Amino acid sequence: MKILIPTAKEMNTDLPSIEAIPLKPESQAVLDALALYSASQLESFYKVSAEKAAEEFQNIQALKRQTAQHYPALKLFDGLMYRNIKRDKLTEAEQDYLENHVFITSALYGVVPVLSPMAPHRLDFLMKLKVAGKTLKSHWKAAYDETLKKEEVIFSLLSSEFETVFSKEIRAKMVTLKFMEDRGGQLKIHSTISKKARGAFLTALIENQVQTVGEARRLNFAGFVYREDLSQPQGLVFVKEV
């Protein structure tokens, strides 16, 4: 069983660094393609300010020179979902669960264990980077599939941009999650609800050592409960009354 989570734009580097590990060939090819961009080219590539582009340029070049600081990915990323995940004061069982079951999908690093060392970087599958003439999705598809081909249960907390990197065969095994609020009988969904709830759901998986879809359906977390009437076998819906 694997749980897939996305990367985040927000990062926190106010952390103890950890030792880097060598990049996979697929990752090195992506880095080599990124490293060809000048700071001014990155400004339009990322659609960011000149100041931000200069910072990203330094991050890329540090990775290229193998001088970049690395941090556990789960703690480096600091978006709303990540801030709602239990990341500290884990029991030994919770730590083991994280290491064995939770994986981050990255456009630079591939599908990697959640505590893997990562350096600060900015890249997602909506960005039009060509790697040896291929799109990022095409470049990564085989490696992404290889990571999950033996898994029977895959919980996906990914957005569609990440899910579509995988083949249809792998996507058919994914259990997707939807989180909604019930406001006086009106069901609402928006990104803030979803991001917070993904983090809370993952925390519930970790704390309850969930291994099956049946166990996930029984979870009650942050006010969310499973709604069978709204769910599909491969698509679980959790609703919070507010």
From Swiss-Prot:
Please report a single Pfam family linked to this protein.
Answer: H2O2_YaaD
Superkingdom of source: Bacteria
GO CC annotations, alphabetized: cytosol
**Its GO biological process terms?**
response to hydroperoxide
Task: Give the UniProt family note.
Answer: Belongs to the UPF0246 family.
* Name the UniProt record assigns to this protein: UPF0246 protein SPP_1571
Species this protein is from = Streptococcus pneumoniae (strain P1031)
Q: What is the lineage of its organism?
A: Bacteria, Bacillati, Bacillota, Bacilli, Lactobacillales
